[in-house]
């Protein structure tokens, strides 16, 4: 525990102080620039937000040395970062969102990477605030309230000035064995395909995304995340401790124009993709890789390292000048104030780590798929399924 604290606190000081600087710059631009030009604000925010998010990329790439292996055909790999895309992924690990950031950074669109997330995420210190300024979409997990919020948020992206990725985890929650068991029981009772490696997708958000963005988003990137049997599952705590993991990502590109128009057919298309994803994960379990798929080299750029070194130098210089000016440690009051500040940073880091844990995630309140046989009735309500998955 002491070792973990010794590692987490210095990283936390760097991340949260630099993050507050970034949040302040974002707030100033939001107030002064956005009212005059939304596109100019977005371009500035893209650069500003990336200077913060690259710190987390550095933790994955350089501090923990997590190896992300990407499997995709050349055409798909070469398209990434050159077009707007809806990214649909299974929610396998605690750091799936960071894996997405790594791939976005390699594709040159980290600053315009977006996601649909639960509303509580925007209140996370520094990271959640930066996401809010960057136009992430936050939902309450209540479709009666979220439908209009999602629709308006999606339509606002129509004039986004740079290629963006919008990530959507349609399972609605992170994968655990307990949630899988609940999903299997529900599927069996509803005469749906019984999943083995994924949860049952909640399709309303996906249908809304396709319906509202098909006119300006040309592609859907179907990503499948898997953890090899020889690697421990990656977590935020392992990252901060500098402990490596391996993550496999399979990417398949679908053209948005090839999707059907009716909403029920869009929903069925999504369910079919997760049935195929389940079968693909079966193959991965058997071979401990995605067999027959080409592995692409995504490298490890030094940009994130350069950003972290720059932040560390600036903050160290600033801290030295501040301490020299304030004589903070010359009194018990100053020492107590410093200890209080460290305590706040440690608490914020714990909040960030705990918020990422799959065991603490909750299922989305979105109606499940209907069985293909419309004469069969499913469980009495979605609440019943959610209670089983908790």
From Swiss-Prot:
<feature type="transmembrane region" description="Helical">
    <location>
        <begin position="333"/>
        <end position="353"/>
    </location>
</feature>
<keyword id="KW-0594">Phospholipid biosynthesis</keyword>
<feature type="transmembrane region" description="Helical">
    <location>
        <begin position="305"/>
        <end position="325"/>
    </location>
</feature>
<dbReference type="InterPro" id="IPR032098">
    <property type="entry name" value="Acyltransf_C"/>
</dbReference>
<keyword id="KW-0256">Endoplasmic reticulum</keyword>
<protein>
    <recommendedName>
        <fullName>1-acyl-sn-glycerol-3-phosphate acyltransferase 2</fullName>
        <ecNumber>2.3.1.51</ecNumber>
    </recommendedName>
</protein>
<comment type="function">
    <text>Converts lysophosphatidic acid (LPA) into phosphatidic acid by incorporating acyl moiety at the 2 position.</text>
</comment>
<dbReference type="Pfam" id="PF16076">
    <property type="entry name" value="Acyltransf_C"/>
</dbReference>
<keyword id="KW-0472">Membrane</keyword>
<feature type="short sequence motif" description="HXXXXD motif">
    <location>
        <begin position="91"/>
        <end position="96"/>
    </location>
</feature>
<comment type="pathway">
    <text>Phospholipid metabolism; CDP-diacylglycerol biosynthesis; CDP-diacylglycerol from sn-glycerol 3-phosphate: step 2/3.</text>
</comment>
<keyword id="KW-0812">Transmembrane</keyword>
<keyword id="KW-0012">Acyltransferase</keyword>
<keyword id="KW-1133">Transmembrane helix</keyword>
<feature type="region of interest" description="Disordered">
    <location>
        <begin position="358"/>
        <end position="390"/>
    </location>
</feature>
<dbReference type="InterPro" id="IPR002123">
    <property type="entry name" value="Plipid/glycerol_acylTrfase"/>
</dbReference>
<dbReference type="Pfam" id="PF01553">
    <property type="entry name" value="Acyltransferase"/>
</dbReference>
<comment type="similarity">
    <text>Belongs to the 1-acyl-sn-glycerol-3-phosphate acyltransferase family.</text>
</comment>
<dbReference type="GO" id="GO:0005789">
    <property type="term" value="C:endoplasmic reticulum membrane"/>
</dbReference>
<keyword id="KW-0444">Lipid biosynthesis</keyword>
<keyword id="KW-1208">Phospholipid metabolism</keyword>
<keyword id="KW-0443">Lipid metabolism</keyword>
<feature type="transmembrane region" description="Helical">
    <location>
        <begin position="2"/>
        <end position="22"/>
    </location>
</feature>
<dbReference type="GO" id="GO:0003841">
    <property type="term" value="F:1-acylglycerol-3-phosphate O-acyltransferase activity"/>
</dbReference>
<dbReference type="GO" id="GO:0016024">
    <property type="term" value="P:CDP-diacylglycerol biosynthetic process"/>
</dbReference>
<keyword id="KW-0808">Transferase</keyword>
């Amino acid at each position: 525990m002491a070792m973990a604290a010794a590692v987490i606190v210095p990283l936390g000081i760097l991340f949260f102080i630099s993050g507050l600087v970034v949040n302040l710059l974002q707030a100033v631009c939001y107030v002064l620039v956005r009212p005059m030009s939304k596109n100019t604000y977005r371009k500035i925010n893209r650069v500003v937000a990336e200077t913060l998010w690259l710190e987390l990329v550095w933790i994955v790439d350089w501090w923990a040395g997590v190896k992300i292996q990407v499997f995709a055909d050349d055409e798909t790999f070469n398209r990434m970062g050159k077009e707007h895309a809806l990214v649909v992924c299974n929610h396998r690990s605690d750091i799936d969102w960071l894996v997405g950031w790594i791939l976005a950074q390699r594709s040159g669109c980290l600053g315009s990477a977006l996601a649909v997330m639960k509303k509580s995420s925007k209140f996370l210190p520094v990271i959640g605030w930066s996401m809010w300024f960057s136009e992430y979409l936050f939902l309450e997990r209540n479709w009666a309230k979220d439908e209009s919020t999602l629709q308006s948020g999606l339509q606002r992206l129509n004039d986004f000035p740079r290629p963006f990725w919008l990530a959507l985890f349609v399972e609605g929650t992170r994968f655990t064995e307990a949630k899988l068991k609940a999903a299997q029981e529900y599927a069996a009772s509803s005469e749906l395909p019984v999943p083995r490696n994924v949860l049952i997708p909640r399709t309303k958000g996906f249908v809304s995304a396709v319906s509202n963005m098909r006119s300006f988003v040309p592609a859907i990137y179907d990503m499948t995340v898997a953890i090899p049997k020889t690697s421990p599952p990656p977590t935020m705590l392992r990252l901060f401790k500098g402990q490596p993991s391996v993550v496999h990502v399979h990417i398949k590109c679908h053209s948005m124009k090839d999707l059907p128009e009716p909403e029920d057919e869009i929903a069925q298309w999504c369910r079919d993709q997760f049935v195929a994803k389940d079968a693909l994960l079966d193959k991965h379990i058997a071979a401990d890789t995605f067999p027959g798929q080409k592995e692409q080299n995504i490298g490890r750029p030094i940009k994130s390292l350069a950003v972290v070194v720059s932040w560390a130098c600036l903050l160290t210089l600033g801290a030295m000048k501040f301490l020299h000016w304030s004589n903070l440690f010359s009194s018990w009051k100053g020492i107590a104030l410093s200890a209080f500040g460290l305590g706040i940073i440690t608490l914020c880091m714990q909040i960030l780590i705990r918020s990422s844990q799959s065991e603490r995630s909750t299922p989305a309140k979105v109606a499940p798929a209907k069985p293909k046989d419309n004469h069969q009735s499913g469980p009495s309500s979605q609440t019943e399924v959610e209670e089983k998955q908790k």
